[in-house]
Swiss-Prot record:
Coiled coil: 1716-1744
Disease: Neurodevelopmental disorder with hypotonia, neonatal respiratory insufficiency, and thermodysregulation: An autosomal recessive disorder characterized by profound neurodevelopmental disability, muscular hypotonia, feeding abnormalities, recurrent fever episodes, infantile spasms, and moderate dysmorphic facial features. Brain imaging shows thin corpus or dysplastic corpus callosum, and additional unspecific abnormalities including gray matter heterotopias, ectopic posterior pituitary, signal abnormalities in basal ganglia, and stratum subependymale.
Source organism of this protein record: Homo sapiens (Human)
SUPFAM superfamilies, alphabetized: ARM repeat, Rap/Ran-GAP
Function comment: Catalytic subunit of the heterodimeric RalGAP1 complex which acts as a GTPase activator for the Ras-like small GTPases RALA and RALB.
One Gene Ontology cellular component annotation held by this UniProt entry: cytoplasm
Gene Ontology biological process terms from the UniProt entry: activation of GTPase activity; regulation of small GTPase mediated signal transduction
Entry keyword Nucleus: yes
Self-association state and partner proteins as the record states: Component of the heterodimeric RalGAP1 complex with RALGAPB. Heterodimerization is required for activity. Interacts with the HLH region of TCF3/isoform E12.
Protein name: Ral GTPase-activating protein subunit alpha-1
Length: 2036
C-alpha cells in the first residue's frame, strides 16, 4: 500500500496504529512514522480507510497532554502538544469530506475552543486560529452559526456584536454565560491550555497581529485540504473570504462604497480632501527621522488588508507565497518544521522566502517586466497546460477574485480605499500603484481586464487555439485570438462548477443574473478609467507642506501616478471615453494642485521646492499638455474640453513651469508641423545638408528621403510628436470601412508592413507592437515628407504606401533595438530618490512616437475633406462670394504665387486677430487642410470639412483662430458663408505631378460625418474624383478606403497629419490665453523670448521651403508657407504695456522688427502697415533708449531695402533714432546697426527730392514734407565719422561718407559739405586705430575713379588730396618705423599705393605746378608737387631721418591748413580696446617658425613699396597707357626675339653662345640685357632712324626692375642722306620698341591730343610745335635756339631746371652775387672778347692760322657683333671707373634662364579675378543659374560698368585662368589701372551648351574668392547654391522697385572689414558698378591679407630680383669685365647677311 519505504517498518507501523491493544501513545508514535514516510496519495487513502482509529489515537493523546499541561506545563509538554496538533492538522487536511459532513463536529469544536482561549499564549492562540480556519474551510456551509460567530471574533479589537446573552465576544462564545440553576447540569469550563510564559514577547497591537494571521492563513491553507474534488479548495477560500468581507470589512473600511463597480463605474472626479492631522508616533532607529501617523481608527488594519490584497498581484518570484506583512521572523511550531514531506513545511519555507524577499525588495524593484506573476491568471497559455493539481495557493485565490463581478469590484474598491489613505501610509499606496502599473503594462492582462465577449466558447473549442502565436495575422485577428486564449479558463471554471456555488451569502440568483455576475470581463478601458479616477485621490489630498518627510512621500506618490498616466498616454491604446477621463482628471488635478491665491503664491516664491505644487508644477503641466496632444491624435476631443483646458491654463500663467512646458511643446509642435505640413525635418533641414545630400539621394517614388538620419530624443514630453505606427488605426478605421474586400486587403497589407517594421521595437512582444512607436524614423520619413523637389501639393494625403516599407524595414529593425524603452515599472516602488529617473523615463518619450497613421497612409488627410454638392458652382462663384468689406485672405499659409495672383491682401490686420490661418472660400483650394478659416470651423472638422455648420458648431473658440489679441477665452463668432468649398486638388482638379515624375501626394475625401452635415447625398464631380482619388500604380483603386480623414476632422485616421499638426499648433499656441495678460513680468518676458525662438523656427521652415535638393532644378514656389506674421497682434499689444513689462516689450519689438525686415511672401495690407508704422513711430521716438536700441538693432540692415509700401514714412524717425544711438554713451548700443541704417539712406535724398515722412519731433502721427533729409543724414554721418567710439561703427560711417561723396559727385550737386566729408576722411588717415585709417585710405582710393568729377566740383581738390597724402605719410613715417606692429607699416604702404594711383590719375602738368607752402618757416623757394612726392618716397626708402635735412623734407600737415581743410580736426578716440596685435605679422601668425622671414619682411615693407612707387613713376608717369592699351604695362619682348643668333622661340642656353648679347646688373636692383640686332629697312617714315642716315645695326636694351620689364631700341644717326659735306654730330635716340597696336582707346584720365606717328615712332605729347624746329621751319622773327629750348622743355619736362619755367628764359641772378660783382664779371667777359677779336684781326693771314682741308672719311663696316652695344655703353659712361661698383656682369647658366623666365611670368600689377553671377526670378539652383546666357538690361548695364569688354583671343593682360581658345567665352569685362588688373568671370559670358562647359564654368567661377551676385529672385541668395570651397565673400545685389540697389555682403567671420559698400548699403545705379568693383577689390585684398606669409606682387618681384642678383652676379676684375663687354662670346664669322 505504501510506496515510499525509507523506514523499514512502515507496514508494521501501520498495523500497530490499527492495533487497538496497543496503548494510545505507542499508536501515536507509529502514526507519525506513517505520516512522515508515506506519499500524500497513499496517506489520504490510509486516513480515509482508518479515520476512526486515527481520530481515536489523536483524541486520547490530546486528553493526556491536556491533563499533563495543566499539572506541569513544562517545555517538553508544550513540544508534545505541538506534535499532537500536527496530527490534528493532518486529520483536518486529509479528511475534509468527512468533516464537511460534520464528522466529530463537537469534539473538534471543543478542541479548537481550548486552543482559541484568550488565556493561552499568543503562539497557541494563533495556532488555534490556523486550525480553526482549516476546519471552517472543510465545513463551509455546513458549519453552525456558532462557528461563524467565532470567526467574527477571531480578531480582537473589533466591537462585539450584541446578542440576547450580551456582547458576543470570543470568551463568551468559548464559555457561554448560561444562566443555569444550581440543579442543572453545567458544562465543564474551558480553560487555557498553555498560559503565557514569562519570557514570551507580547504584541503591542493584537488587532494587527491576528488580522495578519487570519489573512495569511486564509490563503496559504487553501491547498492543504486534500479534497477529492479540487474545486472545493476554491470554495473553501471563497467561503472564508466572503465571511471576512461580511464581518470585518465594514469596520476596517467604514466608508467602503458598494455601488462602485468596474462594470458600471462611477467616474465623477473626487473632491479635494482636507489635510489629516499627523502626529509623530516614533523615530526611525536608523535615520532618526520622525514616523507619522493619523489617529484614525483601524488605519493599520486598512493598510494590512490592502497589502494582503496587493500580494496576490505582486509576487517577487514565481511559485512563492504572498508576503503577509508583519510576519517577519516568525517561527512556526516544530511539528510543522519537522514534517518534511508535508505541504505545510513547503508553505512555511515559502513564507520565509516571501518575507525576506519582500522586505528586501520593497525599496527596490523587480526589474523584469516579464515576470510570470500576473501571467498566471487563467489564460490559455498557462491553464491549458497546467493541471489543476499544480495550481498554487495564490493562483486559486486569484481565480476566486476573478470568478465573479462582486469579487472584482471588491478588489477595485479596496484599491480605491488605498488611494484614500493618508500620505503617511504611502508604502501601501505604492504597492497598489505597482499592481496597477503591472496590469497596465504587462502583455497578459488579468481576466477582468480582457475585452468582454458575446460568444461563449466551450472548453472543447480551446485546444486548437491554445498556442497560436502568429505575427503575420492581422492586428484585429491577433487581438481577438489573444482574447479568446484568455477566455478558456473562465469558461472552464464556469462550465464545471461555478454555477453550483452561486453565492456564499446564501442568496440564490436566477440564471441570467448569475451568468452576468460570472461574466467578469470588463475590458482594459474600464480598468483604466477606474484607475485614473481613483488614483487622482492622491493628488486631491491637501499636502502637508510643513512636514518634509510627508511632502517627499506625497511628491513621490504623485510622480509615480503621473508616470503611469504618462505610460498610458504614450503606450496604451485608449478609447474616447478613457481619453476624456484622463484629460478631465489631469485638468482637475492640475487646477486643484496648482491654483492658489496670489498671496500664497508670492509667499512661496523662491521656495517652490517646499510645496507639493512647486514640486509637481513641471511634471503636471508636462503630463497634461502631452496627454492632450496625444488624445487629439487618437480620438475626437470636444470643444468644451478644449475650452476647459484654455481656461485652466490661462488661469495658471503665474507658474513659470507652465511657460517652460508650453515653450517646449510649441518647439516640438513646430517640428511636427514642419514634418507633416511642410515635409521638413527641422533637425535635418535641406539647407543644412545640401552638400551631403547628393550621395544620400533616393531614386524612389516621391519618398521623403530627408528623414533618414534622425536622432531620437528620448523624452516623454516630446513623445507625442511622432505618431505611433502601431496604434491600430486600421481597427478604428474599420468602423467605417468594413465589408469592402478591397478594404480588408489594403488593411492587411498595411498591417503586415506595420508589424514587420515595428516588431523589433521596445520589447519583444508581438501584440504590443501597435501601441508603440519609438522610432524617429518610422512614420515620418516614409509618409510625412514630400520629396523636397516637388512642389508641396495642396494636400499631403495619399495612399501611396507600399514602396517605402521595403526601404525602411531593415533600418528600423536595426536602429530601434537600441532605442527600446525600458519598462516603466523598473522604478516604481523605489524610494523617491529614484523618481527623477522615472520622470526622465517618462520624458523619454517626448520626441519619439512615430506616425501611427503615417504607417497606414503617408501624411494622410488634409485632403480628407467634405465637399458640398454644389461645389462646382461655388468654384465658379468664388469671386462673387466675398462681402464687400471683407479684406480677403490669401494668408501666409497660401502660396505666395497664388496670393500674388489675386487682388486680395493678407489678413494680417483683420479685425478678428490677424489670423494667419484665415481664408475665404476663394482661397481654400490653396490651403492644405480644410476650413481652418479665420471665420469659423468646427473642432470635429477643424481641418478637414468644408460643410455647412450650425451656430453651435462654429468652433472658433480658443482653438483655431486664437483671437490672440482678444482678452476672452472664447472668440467672437462671425457669420459664415454657407458656400464654402474646401478643395484639395489643383484648381483645375487635375492630378498634380512632381517635376521628377514621381507620384504626387493626392488627397482623398473624408468620411461624410452625418452628425455635422445637412446635405447627406453628396456626389463628387467626376473630374474631381479622379484627382482626389488618384492612387499609385501598384495599388488598385479599391485597395484603399477612400473615405478616411483624421479623427480631428471627424474621420477615423489617427496620428499626425497636416491638418492635425496645423490645428494642434494653432490651438497650443493660444492655449495660454492672451499672453499679454500674464501678470508676472519675468514669465511674460520668458514667453515672448520663446515666441522669438518659435518665430525663428517658422522662418527657418520658410527658408527651407522650395529649396532645390539636387541643385539642378528650381522647385516652384511652395503652396503652403508658414504664418510668419501670426504673432503680430500679441506683439503689437505687448508694445502698449507698462514699463513693468519692459523685457517682454523689448522681445516684442525685436520680433516685430525681425518679422517685418524679412522679404514678405504675402504683402501686408494697408491696415496692418498703418498699425505697424504707428508702433515703429512710437518706438523709435520712445524715451526709453533700450527700446530705440532694440528697434535699430533688429531693423538693420534690411529694413529700407525691402521696399515695404510707405516705409519711407519712417525715414526721419530712423535718422533721429540712429542719431540718438550714435550719440549715446553706451558702447553696447547697436552702434554699427545705426550707422548701417544711416548709410543705407545716403542715396535716398537725390532720388526723392521732397520726402513725405512722419514728423520725428511729434509723438502724434503727422506727415510733413521734408527737403532737408540729406542735410540731416550727412550731419549725423559726419559727426559719427568724427566721434563714434566704436571701431566697426566708425568704419561704416566712413564708408557711408565715401558713398555719399561719390553719389553727390555723380549727381553734380556741388554740395558744400563734400569738402567737410573729404576733410574727415583725410584726417582719419592718421587716426590711431589702424583699421579705421585703412578704411579712410580705401575711401580715398575709390575716389581716384572720380577725379574728373572732383575737378569739376573743385579744380584743386585732386592735387590737394595728393598733398594731404604726402603730408600724412611724412607725419606717420617716423613713428611707424619705430613701431613693431605690422598693421602700422601696412597702413603706410596702403597710403603709398593710394598716392601712386592719385599721381597716375593726374596729368603731369598738374603735378609740375609749383606748390606754395603756407607754413611760417617755409623758405621762399618754390617746389612742384612732384618734387615733394619724390622727397617723401626718398624718405620712405632711406628712412625718416632724411626728413631732418630741410632739403629733403617734403611738406608738413600744417603747410596744408586752409579754409577748406583743417589737418588737425579733432577726432574722438575709440572707446573699445583695440584688438591686441602681436608684434608678429598677422598674416603669418599661423606659421610659427618663420620669425626671421617676418622681421625681414616687416622691416622692408615700406622701403620696397616706396621703391616700387619710384620705379613705377619713372617708367610710367606721363606714358601710361601707351599704344598697346591699358592691358599692356610692360614689354613682351625677350632676348631671343629678332636675334639672328638664336633660333629658339623662348629663352634658351644658345643665347650664351651668341656674340651679340650680354647680361648686366645695375645698382644691384636692375637686370639689363644688351643685344645688337639688325636695323629694319623700308619702314614707313624711316622706322626707328626716322629716315636719317644710320648704321645697319641697332642696340636693344631690355631692362627688368621692380616695376616690370622694358625694352628700348636705339640707333646711331649720321644725318640726312641727301646732305653731303660736314658730317652731323653723332647722336642717339632712345625709344620704346615693339609696341603692339592698341586694343582699346587708352583710358587714362589725361586729355591727350591725337597720337602722331612720325616715321613709325609712336609719340604722345601736348602739341606745342609741329616738329623739331629746323632751319627750314623757323620764321624770320623766331630765334632758333629759343624755339629749340622751348621744344625741349615741353617734350621733356624733366629737363627743366626750374619747374614750369621754359629753358629759354634766363635764370635769375644767384642770390649770393651783388650788382657790382655782376658788372665786374660782365666787364671781364667783354674785355676778354675784345682781346680775342683783336688777336684774330691781327693774325688772320698767318700761315700757322690756316688748317689743312679735311676729306669726308670712307665708312667702315664694324666687324664685331657687339660693336654698337659697347659704343652705347661707353657713351652712357658704363665703362668708367666710377660706375664700376654699380655695374656688373651676370653668370651665364641655365639657372639664370630659369630665373629670368620665372621673373617674366610674375605679374607687375596687383591682379584680381572676380566671379559675376546672374540669378533670374525663381532660380534657386546652380544649374539654372549657370545656364543663364544673358540677363536683364539693368544687369547688362551693370556688367558693362565694371570694366570694358576685351576679346579673350588677343587679350594680352591678366587672363585670370580664362582661355584664348574660346572655350571660356569670347569676351569678358576687364578693368586695369597702372597698378591693378581685374578680370571678371561673368557667368552669362561663358558657354554652357554642354556638361563639360558647365563643369569648366563652375570650376572657373567657383574658384574665385569673391563672388558678385546680381539677384532678381524674390528670395535672398544663399551661399550654398554655387557649391564651392571658395567664395569667401559674396556681394549680392538686389534691384529694388525704386531703381536703387540693395547690397548684401556675406563674408566668412575671419575676413576683416572692407568697404566702401557694407552689408545693408543701398546705392544708386549710377555709382553701383564702380562701388561694387572697388568693394570686390578691397574684399579680395582683405582675403589675401589672411594668407600666411602672403606677399604683394612687388614684394614678390623684389624677392626674385634679389635672389637673381645674389646667386648670379659675377664679380670680375676690370680687365675681365672689359673683355666681356668687348666680346661677349667668341665668334668665327658674322651671319651670312650681316653685311647688308
Amino acid at each position: 500500500m505504501f510506496s515510499k519505504k525509507p523506514h523499514g517498518d512502515v507496514k508494521k507501523s501501520t498495523q500497530k496504529v490499527l492495533d487497538t491493544k496497543k496503548d494510545a501513545l505507542t499508536r501515536l508514535k507509529h502514526l507519525r512514522i506513517v505520516i512522515e514516510n508515506a506519499e500524500s496519495i497513499d496517506l489520504k487513502q490510509f486516513f480515509d480507510q482508518h479515520f476512526s482509529h486515527i481520530y481515536y489515537v489523536f483524541f486520547e493523546n490530546f486528553v493526556t497532554i491536556e491533563a499533563s499541561l495543566k499539572q506541569k506545563g513544562h517545555k517538553s509538554q508544550r513540544e508534545e502538544l505541538d506534535a499532537i496538533l500536527f496530527i490534528f492538522e493532518k486529520i483536518l487536511q486529509l479528511l475534509p469530506e468527512r468533516i464537511h459532513q460534520r464528522w466529530q463536529f463537537h469534539s473538534i469544536g471543543l478542541i479548537l475552543k481550548k486552543l482559541l482561549h484568550t488565556g493561552n499564549s499568543l503562539k497557541i492562540r494563533r495556532e488555534g486560529v490556523r486550525l480553526f480556519l482549516l476546519w471552517l474551510q472543510a465545513l463551509q456551509n455546513n458549519c453552525s452559526k456558532e462557528q461563524l460567530w467565532m470567526f467574527s471574533c477571531l480578531i480582537p479589537g473589533f466591537s462585539a456584536p450584541q446578542s440576547e446573552h450580551g456582547p458576543r465576544t470570543l470568551d463568551n462564545l468559548i464559555n457561554p454565560p448560561l444562566n443555569l440553576q444550581e440543579t442543572q447540569v453545567t458544562i465543564e469550563e474551558i480553560t487555557p491550555l498553555v498560559p503565557p510564559q514569562s519570557g514570551d514577547k507580547g504584541q503591542e497591537d493584537l488587532t494587527s497581529y491576528f488580522l495578519e494571521a487570519l489573512l495569511k492563513y486564509i490563503v496559504i491553507q487553501v491547498k492543504s485540504l486534500e479534497w477529492k474534488n479540487k474545486e472545493n479548495q476554491e470554495r473553501g477560500f471563497s467561503f472564508l473570504f466572503s465571511h471576512f468581507k461580511k464581518y470585518y470589512l465594514p469596520y476596517i473600511f467604514p466608508n467602503i462604497c458598494k455601488e462602485n463597480s468596474l462594470y458600471h463605474p462611477i467616474l465623477d472626479i473626487p473632491q479635494m480632501r482636507p489635510k489629516p492631522h499627523y502626529v509623530v508616533i516614533k523615530k526611525d532607529a536608523e535615520t532618526n527621522e520622525a514616523i507619522y501617523c493619523t489617529k484614525e481608527p483601524f488605519i493599520k488594519a486598512r493598510v494590512i488588508v490592502i497589502r494582503w490584497l496587493v500580494s496576490f498581484w505582486l509576487e517577487p518570484k514565481p511559485h512563492t507565497g504572498p508576503h503577509i506583512p508583519g510576519m517577519e521572523g516568525e517561527v512556526l511550531p516544530k511539528n510543522i518544521q519537522r514534517a518534511a514531506a508535508s505541504l505545510v513545511s513547503r508553505e512555511e519555507s515559502k513564507n520565509d522566502n516571501a518575507d525576506k524577499t519582500d522586505r528586501t525588495t520593497e525599496p527596490e524593484q523587480s526589474h523584469s517586466n516579464t515576470s510570470t506573476l500576473t501571467e498566471r491568471e487563467p489564460s490559455s497559455s498557462s491553464l491549458c497546460s497546467i493541471d489543476e493539481e499544480h495550481l498554487t495557493d495564490i493562483e486559486i485565490v486569484r481565480r476566486v477574485f476573478s470568478s465573479k463581478r462582486s469579487n472584482v469590484n471588491f478588489v477595485t474598491e479596496i484599491f480605491r480605499q488605498a488611494f484614500l489613505l493618508p500620505i503617511c501610509e504611502a508604502a501601501a499606496m505604492r504597492k497598489v500603484v505597482k499592481v496597477y502599473q503591472e496590469w497596465i503594462q504587462q502583455e497578459e492582462k488579468p481576466l477582468f481586464m480582457q475585452e468582454p465577449e458575446e460568444i461563449v466558447i466551450t472548453s472543447s473549442d480551446l485546444p486548437c487555439i491554445e498556442n497560436v502565436t502568429d505575427h503575420d495575422i492581422s492586428m484585429e485577428e491577433g487581438e481577438k485570438r489573444e482574447e479568446e486564449n484568455g477566455t478558456n479558463t473562465a469558461d472552464h471554471v464556469r462550465n464545471s462548477s461555478w454555477a453550483k456555488n452561486g453565492s456564499y451569502q446564501g442568496a440564490l440568483h436566477n440564471a441570467s443574473e448569475e451568468a452576468t455576475e460570472q461574466n467578469i470581463r470588463a475590458g482594459t478601458q474600464a480598468v483604466l478609467q477606474v484607475f485614473i479616477i481613483n488614483s487622482s485621490n492622491i493628488f486631491l489630498l491637501e499636502p502637508a507642506n510643513e512636514i518634509k518627510n510627508l511632502l517627499d512621500e506625497h511628491t513621490d506618490m504623485c510622480k509615480r501616478i503621473l508616470n503611469i498616466y504618462r505610460y498610458m498616454v504614450v503606450q496604451v491604446s485608449m478609447d474616447k471615453k478613457t481619453w476624456e477621463q484622463m484629460l478631465l482628471v489631469l485638468l482637475r488635478v492640475t487646477e486643484s494642485v496648482l491654483k492658489m491665491p496670489s498671496q500664497a503664491f508670492l509667499q512661496f516664491q523662491g521656495k517652490k521646492n517646499m510645496t507639493l505644487a512647486g514640486r509637481l508644477a513641471g511634471p503636471l503641466f508636462q503630463t497634461l499638455i502631452v496627454a492632450w496632444i496625444k488624445a487629439n491624435l487618437n480620438v475626437y476631443i470636444s470643444r468644451e474640453l478644449w475650452d476647459d483646458l484654455l481656461s485652466v491654463l490661462s488661469s495658471l500663467t503665474y507658474w513659470e513651469e507652465l511657460a517652460t512646458e508650453w515653450s517646449l511643446t510649441m518647439e516640438t509642435l513646430t517640428k511636427v508641423l514642419a514634418r507633416n505640413l511642410y515635409s521638413l525635418d527641422l533637425s535635418d533641414l535641406p539647407l543644412d545638408k545640401l552638400s551631403e545630400q547628393k550621395q544620400k539621394k533616393h531614386k524612389g517614388k516621391g519618398v521623403g528621403h530627408e528623414f533618414q538620419k534622425v536622432s531620437v530624443d528620448k523624452s516623454f514630453s516630446r513623445g507625442w510628436s511622432r505618431d505611433q505606427p502601431g496604434q491600430a488605426p486600421m481597427r478604428q478605421r474599420s468602423a467605417t470601412t468594413t465589408g469592402s474586400p478591397g478594404t480588408e486587403k489594403a488593411r492587411s497589407i498595411v498591417r503586415q508592413k506595420t508589424v514587420d517594421i515595428d516588431d523589433a521595437q521596445i520589447l519583444p512582444r508581438s501584440t504590443r507592437v501597435r501601441h508603440f512607436s519609438q522610432s524617429e524614423e518610422t512614420g515620418n520619413e516614409v509618409f510625412g515628407a514630400l520629396n523636397e523637389e516637388q512642389p508641396l501639393p495642396r494636400s499631403s494625403s495619399t495612399s501611396d504606401i507600399l514602396e517605402p516599407f521595403t526601404v525602411e524595414r531593415a533600418k528600423v529593425n536595426k536602429e530601434d533595438m537600441s532605442q527600446k524603452l525600458p519598462p516603466l515599472n523598473s522604478d516604481i516602488g523605489g524610494s523617491s530618490a529614484n523618481v527623477p529617473d522615472l520622470m526622465d523615463e517618462f520624458i523619454a518619450e517626448r520626441l519619439r512616437s512615430g506616425n501611427a497613421s503615417t504607417m497606414t497612409r503617408r501624411g494622410s488627410s488634409p485632403g480628407s475633406l467634405e465637399i458640398p454638392k454644389d461645389l462646382p458652382d461655388i468654384l465658379n462663384k468664388q469671386n462673387q462670394m466675398r462681402p464687400i468689406d471683407d479684406p480677403g485672405v490669401p494668408s501666409e499659409w497660401t502660396s505666395p504665387a497664388s496670393a500674388g495672383s489675386s487682388d486680395l491682401i493678407s489678413s494680417d490686420s483683420h479685425s478678428d486677430s490677424f489670423s494667419a490661418f484665415q481664408y475665404d472660400g476663394r482661397k481654400f483650394d490653396n490651403f492644405g487642410f480644410g476650413t481652418d478659416t479665420g471665420v469659423t470651423s468646427s473642432a470635429d472638422v477643424d481641418s478637414g470639412s468644408g460643410h455647412h455648420q450650425s451656430a453651435e458648431e462654429q468652433e472658433v473658440a480658443s482653438l483655431t483662430t486664437l483671437h490672440i489679441d482678444s482678452e476672452t477665452s472664447s472668440l467672437n463668432q462671425q457669420a459664415f458663408s454657407a458656400e464654402v468649398a474646401t478643395i484639395t486638388g489643383s484648381e483645375s482638379a487635375s492630378p498634380v505631378h512632381s517635376p521628377l515624375g514621381s507620384r504626387s501626394q493626392t488627397p482623398s475625401p473624408s468620411t461624410l460625418n452625418i452628425d455635422h452635415m445637412e446635405q447627406k447625398d453628396l456626389q463628387l464631380d467626376e473630374k474631381l474624383h479622379h484627382s482626389v482619388l488618384q492612387t499609385p500604380d501598384d495599388l488598385e483603386i479599391s485597395e484603399f478606403p477612400s473615405e478616411c480623414c483624421s479623427v480631428m476632422a471627424g474621420g477615423t485616421l489617427t496620428g499626425w497629419h497636416a491638418d492635425v499638426a496645423t490645428v494642434m499648433w494653432r490651438r497650443m499656441l493660444g492655449i495660454l490665453g492672451d499672453v499679454n495678460s500674464i501678470m508676472d513680468p519675468e514669465i511674460h518676458a520668458q514667453v515672448f523670448d520663446y515666441l522669438c525662438e518659435l518665430w525663428q523656427n517658422l522662418a527657418k521652415i520658410r527658408d527651407n521651403l522650395g529649396i532645390s535638393t539636387d541643385n539642378l532644378t528650381s522647385p516652384s514656389p511652395p503652396v503652403l508657407i508658414p504664418p510668419l506674421r501670426i504673432l503680430t497682434p500679441w506683439l503689437f499689444k505687448a508694445t502698449m504695456l507698462t514699463d513693468k513689462y519692459k523685457q517682454g516689450k523689448l522681445h516684442a519689438y525685436k520680433l516685430i522688427c525681425n518679422t517685418m525686415k524679412r522679404r514678405q511672401d504675402v504683402s501686408p495690407n494697408r491696415d496692418f502697415l498703418t498699425h505697424f508704422y504707428n508702433i515703429m513711430h512710437c518706438g523709435l521716438l520712445h524715451i526709453d533708449q533700450d527700446i530705440v536700441n532694440t528697434i535699430i538693432k533688429h531693423c538693420s540692415p534690411q529694413f529700407f531695402s525691402l521696399g515695404l509700401p510707405g516705409a519711407t514714412m519712417l525715414i526721419m524717425d530712423f535718422i533721429v533714432a540712429a542719431g540718438r544711438v550714435a550719440s549715446s554713451a553706451f558702447l553696447n548700443a547697436p552702434r554699427v546697426e545705426a550707422q548701417v541704417l544711416l548709410g543705407s539712406l545716403v542715396c535716398f535724398p537725390n532720388l526723392y527730392c521732397e520726402l513725405p515722412s512722419l514728423h520725428p519731433n511729434i509723438p502724434d502721427v503727422a506727415v510733413s514734407q521734408f527737403t532737408d533729409v540729406k542735410e540731416l543724414i550727412i550731419k549725423t554721418v559726419l559727426s559719427s565719422a568724427r566721434d563714434e567710439p566704436s571701431g566697426p561703427a566708425r568704419c561704416v560711417a566712413l564708408c557711408s561718407l565715401g558713398i555719399w561723396i561719390c553719389e553727390e559727385l555723380v549727381h553734380e550737386s556741388h554740395h558744400p559739405q563734400i569738402k567737410e566729408a573729404l576733410n574727415v576722411i583725410c584726417v582719419s588717415l592718421k587716426f590711431t586705430n589702424k583699421t579705421v585709417a585703412h578704411v579712410a585710405c580705401n575711401m580715398l582710393h575709390m575716389l581716384v575713379h572720380y577725379v574728373p568729377r572732383l575737378q569739376i566740383y573743385q579744380p584743386d581738390s585732386p592735387l590737394k588730396i595728393i598733398q594731404i597724402l604726402i603730408a600724412t605719410i611724412t607725419h606717420l613715417l617716423p613713428s611707424t618705423e619705430a613701431s613693431s606692429y605690422e598693421m602700422d607699416k601696412r597702413l603706410v604702404v596702403s597710403l603709398l599705393l593710394c598716392l601712386l594711383d592719385w599721381i597716375m590719375a593726374l596729368p603731369l602738368k598738374t603735378l609740375l605746378q609749383p606748390f606754395h607752402a603756407t607754413g611760417a618757416e617755409s623758405d621762399k623757394t618754390e617746389k612742384s608737387v612732384l618734387n615733394c612726392i619724390y622727397k617723401v618716397l626718398h624718405g620712405c626708402v632711406y628712412g625718416a631721418q632724411c626728413f631732418s635735412n630741410p632739403r629733403y623734407f617734403p611738406m608738413s600737415l600744417s603747410d596744408l591748413a586752409s579754409v577748406d581743410y583743417d589737418p588737425f580736426m579733432h577726432l574722438e578716440s575709440l572707446k573699445e580696446p583695440e584688438p591686441l596685435h602681436s608684434p608678429d605679422s598677422e598674416r603669418s601668425s599661423k606659421l610659427q617658425p618663420v620669425t626671421e622671414v617676418k622681421t625681414q619682411m616687416q622691416h622692408g615693407l615700406i622701403s620696397i613699396a616706396a621703391r616700387t612707387v619710384i620705379t613705377h613713376l619713372v617708367n610710367h608717369l606721363g606714358h601710361y597707357p601707351m599704344s598697346g592699351g591699358p592691358a599692356m604695362l610692360t614689354s613682351q619682348v625677350c632676348e631671343n626675339h629678332d636675334n639672328h643668333y638664336s633660333e629658339s622661340t623662348e629663352l634658351s642656353p644658345e643665347l650664351f653662345e651668341s656674340p651679340n648679347i650680354q647680361f648686366f646688373v645695375l645698382n644691384n636692383t636692375t637686370l639689363v640685357s644688351c643685344i645688337q640686332i639688325r636695323s629694319e629697312e623700308n619702314m614707313p617714315g624711316g622706322g626707328l632712324s626716322a629716315g636719317l642716315a644710320s648704321a645697319n645695326s641697332n642696340v636693344r636694351i631690355i631692362v627688368r626692375d621692380l616695376s616690370g620689364k622694358y625694352s628700348w631700341d636705339s640707333a646711331i644717326l649720321y644725318g640726312p642722306p641727301p646732305v653731303s659735306g660736314l658730317s652731323e654730330p653723332t647722336s642717339f635716340m632712345l625709344s620704346l620698341s615693339h609696341q603692339e597696336k592698341p586694343e582699346e582707346p587708352p583710358t587714362s584720365n589725361e586729355c591727350l591730343e591725337d597720337i602722331t606717328v612720325k616715321d613709325g615712332l609712336s609719340l604722345q605729347f601736348k602739341r606745342f610745335r609741329e616738329t623739331v624746329p629746323t632751319w627750314d621751319t623757323i620764321r624770320d622773327e623766331e630765334d632758333v635756339l629759343d624755339e629749340l629750348l622751348q621744344y625741349l622743355g615741353v617734350t621733356s619736362p624733366e629737363c627743366l631746371q626750374r619747374t614750369g619755367i621754359s629753358l629759354n628764359i634766363p635764370a635769375p641772378q644767384p642770390v649770393c652775387i651783388s650788382e657790382k660783382q655782376e658788372n665786374d664779371v660782365i666787364n671781364a667777359i667783354l674785355k676778354q672778347h675784345t682781346e680775342e677779336k683783336e688777336f684774330v684781326e691781327k693774325h688772320f693771314n698767318d700761315l700757322n692760322m690756316k688748317a689743312v682741308e679735311q676729306d669726308e672719311p670712307i665708312p667702315q663696316k664694324p666687324q664685331s657683333a657687339f660693336y654698337y652695344c659697347r659704343l652705347l655703353l661707353s657713351i652712357l659712361g658704363m665703362n668708367s671707373w666710377d660706375k664700376r661698383r654699380s655695374f656688373h656682369l651676370l653668370k651665364k647658366n641655365e639657372k639664370l634662364l630659369r630665373e629670368l623666365r620665372n621673373l617674366d611670368s610674375r605679374q607687375c600689377r596687383e591682379t584680381h579675378k572676380i566671379a559675376v553671377f546672374y540669378v533670374a526670378e525663381g532660380q534657386e539652383d546652380k544649374h539654372s543659374i549657370l545656364t543663364n546666357t544673358g540677363g536683364s538690361q539693368a544687369y547688362e548695364d551693370f556688367v558693362a560698368g565694371l570694366g570694358w569688354e576685351v576679346n579673350l583671343t588677343n587679350h594680352c593682360g591678366f587672363m585670370g585662368g580664362l582661355q584664348k581658345n574660346k572655350s571660356t567665352g569670347l569676351t569678358t569685362p576687364y578693368f586695369a589701372t597702372s597698378t591693378v588688373e581685374v578680370i571678371f568671370h561673368v557667368s552669362t559670358r561663358m558657354p554652357s551648351d554642354s556638361d563639360d562647359s558647365l563643369t569648366k564654368k563652375l570650376r572657373h567661377l567657383g574658384n574665385d574668392e569673391v563672388h558678385i551676385v546680381w539677384s532678381e529672385h524674390t528670395r535672398d541668395y544663399r551661399r550654398g547654391i554655387i557649391p564651392t570651397e571658395f567664395g569667401d565673400v559674396l556681394i549680392v545685389i538686389y534691384p529694388m522697385k525704386n531703381h536703387m540697389f540693395s547690397i548684401q555682403i556675406m563674408k566668412k567671420p575671419e575676413v576683416p572689414f572692407f568697404g566702401p559698400l557694407f552689408d545693408g548699403a543701398i546705392v544708386n545705379g549710377k555709382v553701383l558698378p564702380i562701388m561694387v568693383r572697388a568693394t570686390a577689390i578691397n574684399a579680395s585684398r582683405a582675403l589675401k591679407s589672411l594668407i600666411p606669409l602672403y606677399q604683394n606682387f612687388y614684394e614678390e618681384r623684389a624677392r626674385y630680383l634679389q635672389t637673381i642678383v645674389q646667386h648670379h652676379l659675377e664679380p670680375t676684375t676690370f680687365e675681365d669685365f672689359a673683355a666681356q663687354v668687348f666680346s661677349p662670346a667668341p665668334y668665327h664669322h658674322l651671319p651670312s647677311d650681316a653685311d647688308h
